[in-house]
């Protein structure tokens, strides 16, 4: 490896350990990181930093880093992003973080390699015991520490000559994930650490703003910070439903809540970090406009650049940004089952249905009282009202749900449809994912006899002008007038799995709201989109052909109707046949 190490060895599993100094380990790690960059990437990095030597002692200030990354000068995220890159660059010696030092070139290279999923995987040889989410949490927790505490840790940890263990496979193949200083995060008990809710909100909002693939310039999206921030708050409340914008500076998020929330509610949220520092690895003029994913061209109240960014935390990027087609928007086509059917039933590919509104505050209207007779409140949910989980803060908050349906829509007055890929999402005021279970298969129904639309329900009881909904333990129900919606969450045993909190408890609650927006968007692969376009073109051609036939026979038909006295002005109310 080009560095001398002592000969003290001991056998451990399939690798052995040797003793090295802190300085030796750091140099070996830096050499490994550099080897994971291509020559053109190293060249571009030096050109962008205006240095000739990769070992240059130049240190980047926050202003220089902001300019290099193309961030707006006064963006609220600048300090958090700069400190994240800087602290990540101290890897693996996190107890040696110096709050007074800038970002050196070796630190920047470490941050580049560690933040990119491909190089991270190669560096740690795909060892699943060392998780990227753990590393991100640790860095954010260090950012949340008071500076005097960071300086105290620095004073007690700096020792270039300290003896450390280096894990080797074979003669010189270093197994970094099994090195003690890396495996235990520089002797840090990560499970006892906390992340500031404010830093987390800023960090997540930044990730949403840069989530669009192949974005060459962050400034345009970051200039819309407040719009992304509202969706970032939806994500933050997923970690702790009691967090509000006012309590951001006083609230914290622990390790268990951070990891479980990332894994179950927003598995893709950290993916934008993959390209965070990519702009430094390319010459500025080398990215053309054709390389950039175009802006989303069709926006509605529920679907726009900001909501798509949040949706991409649970769904694939290519689906969110290039495979959506507007099918039905209630505010444009009317809130009726017939309009819904006419717009959606010809789409023979997966769809995402979005439902949004505000909690019902006036419970004395005739229409709602009738709906409450058809869908009685859950006693179990009423008994739990006022719990710590209680509905994410206040009645004025907008509730937004989405349902991914893998099969095409159809009328189902007797049997439900859908498959195991059907998934319910909550998007505001917090985010949650409710995947299908194997216990029941009542995934979806579209009932044209007065039963409305249901996900996770049995078909409603409809007889003698009586309607009774039969909701599942985790279900989303829309009445036949597309006016009211209920999300019920009582526990296990239904067609969808419930949310499980950090302490393994299952919250019991029910959200009832008046629908203000209802939209359906088609999605699928390029092949499916092309086939659908051909089908629609054929249907349009057939419709035009029928119109021509009607026009050709109009004269004969009218003459017959006039003879029967059914059309024309004959001075009489009608004729007889």
Swiss-Prot record:
Q: Could you tell me the Gene Ontology terms of the biological process aspect for this record?
A: protein-containing complex disassembly; response to oxidative stress
Q: Which InterPro entries match?
A: TLDc_dom
Q: Where in the cell is it found?
A: Cytoplasm
UniProt keywords, alphabetically: Cytoplasm
Q: Name the predominant localization.
A: cytoplasm
Which cellular component appears as one GO term in the record?
fungal-type vacuole membrane
Q: Where is the TLDc domain?
A: 301-524
What this protein is reported to do is described as: May be involved in a process influencing telomere capping.
| Membership in a protein family | Belongs to the RTC5 family.
- PANTHER family for this protein: NUCLEOLAR PROTEIN 7/ESTROGEN RECEPTOR COACTIVATOR-RELATED, RESTRICTION OF TELOMERE CAPPING PROTEIN 5
Q: What is this protein called?
A: Restriction of telomere capping protein 5
**What lineage does the source organism belong to?**
Eukaryota, Fungi, Dikarya, Ascomycota, Saccharomycotina
């Amino acid at each position: 490896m080009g560095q001398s190490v002592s000969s003290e060895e001991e056998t451990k599993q399939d690798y052995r350990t040797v003793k090295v100094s802190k300085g030796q380990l750091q140099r070996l790690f830096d050499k490994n990181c550099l080897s994971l960059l291509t020559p053109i990437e190293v060249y571009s990095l030096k050109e962008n930093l205006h240095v000739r030597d990769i070992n240059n002692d130049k240190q980047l200030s926050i202003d220089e880093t902001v300019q290099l990354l193309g961030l707006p000068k006064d963006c609220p995220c600048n300090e958090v992003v700069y400190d994240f890159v800087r602290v990540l660059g101290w890897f693996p010696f996190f107890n040696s973080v110096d709050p007074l030092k800038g970002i050196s070139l070796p630190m920047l290279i470490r941050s580049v390699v560690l933040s990119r999923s491909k190089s991270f995987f190669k560096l740690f040889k795909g060892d699943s015991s060392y998780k990227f989410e753990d590393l991100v949490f640790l860095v954010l927790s260090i950012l949340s520490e008071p500076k005097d505490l960071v300086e105290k840790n620095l004073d007690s940890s700096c020792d270039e000559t300290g003896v450390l263990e280096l894990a080797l496979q074979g003669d010189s193949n270093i197994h970094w994930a099994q090195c003690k200083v890396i495996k235990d995060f520089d002797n840090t008990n990560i499970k006892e650490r906390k992340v500031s809710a404010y830093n987390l909100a800023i960090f997540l909002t930044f990730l949403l703003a840069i989530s669009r693939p192949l974005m060459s310039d962050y400034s345009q999206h970051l200039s819309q910070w407040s719009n992304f921030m509202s969706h970032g708050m939806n994500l933050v409340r997923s970690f702790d439903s009691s967090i509000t914008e006012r309590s951001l500076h006083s609230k914290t998020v622990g390790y268990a809540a951070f990891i479980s929330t990332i894994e179950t509610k927003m598995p893709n949220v950290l993916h934008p970090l993959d390209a965070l520092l990519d702009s430094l690895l390319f010459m500025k003029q080398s990215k053309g406009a054709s390389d950039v994913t175009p802006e989303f061209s069709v926006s509605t109240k529920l679907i726009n650049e900001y909501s798509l960014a949040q949706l991409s935390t649970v769904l694939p990027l290519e689906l969110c940004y290039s495979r959506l087609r507007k099918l039905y928007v209630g505010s444009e086509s009317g809130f009726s089952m017939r309009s819904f059917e006419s717009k959606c039933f010809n789409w023979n590919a997966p769809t995402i249905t979005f439902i949004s509104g505000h909690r019902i505050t006036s419970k004395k209207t005739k229409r709602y009282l009738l709906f409450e007779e058809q869908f009685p409140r859950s006693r179990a949910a009423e008994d739990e009202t006022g719990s710590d989980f209680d509905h994410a803060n206040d009645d004025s908050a907008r509730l937004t749900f989405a349902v991914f349906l893998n099969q095409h829509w159809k009328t189902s007055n007797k049997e439900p449809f859908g498959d195991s890929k059907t998934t319910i999402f909550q998007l505001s005021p917090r985010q949650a994912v409710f995947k299908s279970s194997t216990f029941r298969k009542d995934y979806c129904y579209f009932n044209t006899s007065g039963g409305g639309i249901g996900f996770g329900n049995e078909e409603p009881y409809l007889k003698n002008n009586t309607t009774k909904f039969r909701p599942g333990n985790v279900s989303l129900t829309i009445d036949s007038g597309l006016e009211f919606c209920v999300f019920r969450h009582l526990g296990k045993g239904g067609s969808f799995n419930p949310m499980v909190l950090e302490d393994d408890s299952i919250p019991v609650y029910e959200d009832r709201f008046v629908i203000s927006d209802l939209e359906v968007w088609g999605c699928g692969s390029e092949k499916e989109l092309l086939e659908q376009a051909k089908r629609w073109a054929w249907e349009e051609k057939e419709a035009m052909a029928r119109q021509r036939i009607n026009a050709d026979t109009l004269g004969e038909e009218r003459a017959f109707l006039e003879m029967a006295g059914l059309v024309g002005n004959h001075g009489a109310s009608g004729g007889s046949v």
